């Protein structure tokens, strides 16, 4: 054990005399020290707790490109990377500069009712396309590659191929036009925010249809995410053809059962009336 060998200094013997001038000086010094300590201890005015305002997405970056003669400009985003079941749905949107819907925001910040309202407004005023990567493709390629594939297909399915596309996230797309990755883009760029709404609403509607195809899992409630109710159903019923086989909870459920599910029913591929495959794109 190491002990501190430093001893406190002993007070000088006797009682020190204090003159009125010295007492006044000491009091002033003590007051100043106390004030300095109080300032140091308390936060500066206006730096306490407060609400951080978040500006909504704007059309500013699209307009900057338009002024340079670059048009059409699209935004794209996906919904459904995290769930244990169902497809990834990607959307691409070219907004009309004269009819940018008010209230656009990251779909995760909006209520279901507001998303539905904006979905209809976006479809009525903008060029919109969607593409789905099925659970089969996700199982085969992995979730990232399947998502990028769906995003690329959505861009190429637009009525007019854009000259520039903003994509939410870190990864650029292998599109036939210039693509720009923007981290957090669904909260910054209006076109991406619109795409996030289209993707989210489309996928939610699809999961409600899959709930009819595979009752008991509660897809219409949790949309395939790994909530306790879904995990309980997965343990009780085993994986369905719409589950992503290599996601950990699904893989664990597979280990407890024998055999394999039938091939996908084609419901995912038939959403827009196109032949079933491992994914597809359509214009809304």
Swiss-Prot record:
Residues 1-40, 265-284 are annotated as: Disordered. Residues 1-36 have a biased composition (Low complexity). One of its GO terms (molecular function) is RNA binding. Belongs to the RNase HII family. Its EC number is 3.1.26.4. One of its GO terms (biological process) is mismatch repair. Manganese or magnesium. Binds 1 divalent metal ion per monomer in the absence of substrate. May bind a second metal ion after substrate binding. Its cofactor is Mn(2+); Mg(2+). Endonuclease that specifically degrades the RNA of RNA-DNA hybrids. The gene is rnhB. It holds the Pfam family RNase_HII. Its main location: cytoplasm. It catalyses: Endonucleolytic cleavage to 5'-phosphomonoester. It is an enzyme of class 3 (hydrolase). A divalent metal cation binds at residues 77-78, 168. This is Ribonuclease HII.
């Amino acid at each position: 054990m190491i002990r501190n060998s430093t001893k406190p200094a002993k007070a000088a013997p006797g009682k020190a005399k204090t003159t009125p001038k010295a007492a006044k000086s000491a009091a002033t010094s003590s007051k100043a020290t106390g004030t300095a300590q109080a300032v140091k201890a308390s936060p500066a005015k206006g730096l306490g707790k407060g609400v951080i305002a978040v500006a909504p997405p704007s059309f500013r970056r699209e307009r900057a490109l338009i002024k340079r003669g670059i048009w059409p400009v699209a935004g794209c985003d996906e919904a459904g990377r995290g769930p244990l079941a169902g497809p990834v749905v990607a959307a691409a949107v070219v907004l009309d500069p004269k009819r940018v819907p008010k209230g656009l925001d990251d779909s995760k910040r909006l209520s279901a009712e507001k998303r539905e309202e904006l979905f209809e407004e976006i479809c009525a005023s903008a060029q919109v396309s969607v593409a789905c990567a099925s659970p089969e493709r996700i199982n085969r390629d992995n979730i990232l590659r399947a998502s990028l594939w769906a995003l690329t297909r959505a861009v190429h399915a637009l009525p007019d191929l854009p000259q520039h596309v903003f994509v939410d996230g870190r990864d650029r797309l292998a599109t036939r036009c210039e693509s720009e990755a923007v981290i957090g883009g669904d909260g910054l760029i209006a076109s991406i925010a619109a795409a996030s709404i289209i993707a989210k609403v489309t996928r939610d509607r699809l999961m409600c249809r899959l709930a009819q195809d595979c009752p008991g899992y509660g897809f219409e409630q949790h949309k395939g995410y790994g909530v306790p109710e879904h995990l309980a159903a997965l343990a009780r019923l085993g994986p369905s053809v719409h589950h992503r086989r290599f996601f950990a909870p699904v893989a664990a459920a597979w280990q407890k059962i024998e055999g394999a599910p039938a091939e996908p029913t084609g419901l995912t591929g038939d959403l827009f009336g196109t032949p079933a495959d491992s994914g597809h794109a359509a214009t809304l």
